[in-house]
A protein has these predicted regions:
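Gly/Ser-rich helix-loop-strand patches that form or flank binding pockets
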Residues: 1-45, 129-174
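Short acidic active-site motifs
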Residues: 23, 96, 120-126, 155
Length: 174
């Protein structure tokens, strides 16, 4: 979680966070269903959902995860009145316009709501969530175990401490 007294600063030191198992990371790594991590202290109407996908995914697992993320985000948006769906993906500078077009098609959103950002996936998600004032970010996680999980973590885990929005993590088990 985040220390509410210091906006934008993680509660856990990043190096310590990578090496120690914290309850939220353990839940994410062992989940067999989507996990909702609530950051907001009060329930508020859902006005903006952000689907975080990898438009450049080149393997079946990540493409399937993209499909599941978009399906969850679309369902949540359709269940709320006056809610808008945005989509974000990190991309290379040379492909930005083409990837933004692909992202809009993939997510089924107007081009103005498809954000292909030249950044790391974590930074693209966090920056876009702040820019569009997302109430909820839907993100995917490919479950990892062992030393690789301990050292690298994944984008959902890295974004967890710095996002202000609630986070719905859709897990794809390998």
């Amino acid at each position: 979680g985040r220390d509410r007294g210091r906006p934008g600063r993680p509660l856990h030191h990043p190096a310590r966070r990578r090496l120690l198992k914290t309850s939220d990371w353990v839940v994410l790594r062992r989940a067999v269903c989507p996990v909702l991590l609530v950051k907001q202290e009060q329930a508020t109407p859902l006005r903006c959902v952000l689907a975080a996908v990898d438009v450049e995914a080149d393997d079946d697992a990540h493409r399937q995860l993209n499909t599941e993320i978009i399906a969850c985000a679309t369902q949540l948006k359709s269940g709320a009145s006056d809610c808008v769906l945005h989509a974000v993906s990190a991309c290379q500078a040379s492909d930005r316009l083409r990837q933004a077009t692909r992202l809009a098609t993939m997510a089924g959103v107007e081009p103005a709501y498809a954000h292909a950002l030249v950044a790391t996936p974590e930074d693209a998600i966090v920056d876009c969530a702040a820019w569009v004032a997302a109430d909820l970010v839907v993100i995917g996680s490919v479950a990892r175990h062992g030393l690789g999980a301990k050292i690298h973590g994944n984008t959902a885990e890295r974004a967890l401490d710095v996002l202000d929005a609630d986070l719905l993590v859709v897990t794809l088990r390998r």
